[in-house]
Amino acid sequence: GRLLACLLLPGLAATDFTATVLHTNDVHGRFEQITASGTRCTKQAAEAQQCVGGIARQKTVVSQAAASGANVLFLNAGDYYQGSIWYYVLGAPIVAEAVNYLAHDAMALGNHEFDRGAEGLVPLLTESRVPIVGCNVDFSEEPTLKPLQPKPSVVVERAGIKIGLIGYTTMNTTYLSSPGKVRFTDEAECIQREAQRLRREEGVQVIIAVGHSGVPRDLEICERVPEVSLVVGGHTHTFLYSGPTENGRVSGDKPQGPYPIVVDRAADSRCLVVQDFYMGKYMGNISITWNQRGEVVRWSGQPVLLDRSIPEDPDGIALLDRYRDRVAQSQASVVAESKVLLDGDKNRCRLDECNLGNLVMDAFLKKMASLPSPQASWTRVAAVIANAGGIRASIDEQSTGGRITFEDVVNVLPFGNTLVEMNVTGAQLKGLLEHGVHRHDVKGYVPPAELVLAAGLRVVYDIQREPYDRVVEAHILCTECRVPRYEPLEYARQYRIAALSYIVHGGDNFDFSFVKPKDMYDTGFQDAEIVMKYMNSTSPITTALDGRVTFLKTNQASDACLNLASPFLVLLVLVVFYHL
């Protein structure tokens, strides 16, 4: 076996080799510093040195590591697009300028890089000087991108050792974003194929995969591809950390696993998986030693909190200053005031009711009620629905002095989705609610993004039941009534609803194929604009939790099952019929 390894790895060093891998993922447009909770860094917070992150601090960490004499690699695992006023106003060109300034050794494409279609990716691919890699991304059927096909990998050299950096992007991009005719193939298959080619044809000794598919998929890559010794991942915003904590947290963040996750394989082979949370708050930092066979023998390191102890690089500040006036025209306008924290934390909004989700959905329902409605109806639709993954940030009333700005709202809703009207039956609506909780698992690495946020609906779930049979009870607002009230959802009855365009078009794997396109009406009303107007008209904001979503505990679930009786049997029959 050792002889075969030497034949596979020509030019292998006679001694162990050590390199420091710095990495980020899911920066989501946070080019300048933010608060520890991810909200905008106000002037007061900046003066008090309470803010973290930003590309200028990233650059300082990379420069300091290189100056120490270490063999440094700096990688990014995708999703620079979306999530901030900077991207909202400036788009892809600011991303290209930022990555050129940071000078990653390689970066992968995330699913959000495709949010503005094929055309939205062109500026990054044409203006970036950073190698963008993707072995499972096929542009051949997409005319706009065909000439810009990324290479599957790039080879860099450190201390005479050749290192292969192979990129990949989640196959789910097809329904998570708007990639047009771009195809995404199996990550592990293409990584193994490229790894074997790199060793055979280019004499590469160390193989690192960098990409955007999430921790569960990254673990699978480690298990299926023995050539890979390190996977630098993204997509799931997972905070891996093994250092000291205060009350189980680091800067307010609860670690979701060790850093790195170690996958032990046969014959003393192991593979490491790392991820760096999201929004550029930390810099992933791992030092790895490989032996003569290109296998990991030891490692050390932790994500570095990019706080005030790390100075901001002047060139990074100067880069942002060139665009600050353009951004500021939209950035600072005050929309409303809030008396409460508007909680958009993904570990709450994707797992349970959250008050920011309630506010957004109430704004949508109010907008629809303001439009002309059928005779005898007080509103145009009975309910509105969206996916919890569309809530991208909180609004912290303490750090902002209670003022909500245009920037704050764009940080929450950066995607520019619209509301789409349609008629659905109660059974079809229940099917959408079931899809929202079919992967619900509070213990998982990945809080699923598809939990249904709603206004005009009150839903009770029992997660102990089998997927697609978890809706215990649902009530919906009456529309042909002078005093709005919640009534039991009737599965055979037709209802008029509005849904966010993202899920209507298949986002988060929602299926609206039961509605013909000609029977859908896209209102054209954009989510962030609706919410800003609603906030302005209802200021000061005091949105609370109101019980519109309930997850039963085990004893409650038993009682609920006893009380459902014949309506429950009807529900079962309709669900079976719907899924045939």
From Swiss-Prot:
EC category name: hydrolase
Keyword Signal: yes
One Gene Ontology MF term: nucleotide binding
Signal peptide: 1-14
Positions marked as site (Transition state stabilizer): 112, 115
Entry's localization field: Cell membrane
Annotated binding of Zn(2+) 1, by residue: 26, 28, 79
CDD domains (alphabetical): MPP_CD73_N
Binding site for Zn(2+) 2: 79, 111, 212, 235
Residue numbers binding substrate: 350, 387, 392, 415, 502-508
Post-translational modification summary for this protein: Glycosylated.
Membrane association type: Lipid-anchor; GPI-anchor
Phosphoprotein found in the keyword field: no
Residues of this chain annotated as glycosylated in UniProt: 172, 285, 423, 536
EC number(s) stated in the UniProt entry for this protein: 3.6.1.45, 3.1.3.5
Propiece residues: 556-580
Coarse class of the protein's main subcellular location: membrane
Cofactor(s) required for function per UniProt: Zn(2+)
Cross-referenced SUPFAM superfamilies: 5'-nucleotidase (syn. UDP-sugar hydrolase), C-terminal domain, Metallo-dependent phosphatases
GPI-anchor amidated asparagine lipid modification positions: 555
Tissues in which the UniProt entry reports expression: Gut, ovaries and salivary glands.
GO terms classed as biological process: AMP catabolic process
Subunit-structure text: Homodimer.
Similarity section: Belongs to the 5'-nucleotidase family.
Known function: Degradation of external UDP-glucose to uridine monophosphate and glucose-1-phosphate, which can then be used by the cell.
Protein name per the record: Protein 5NUC
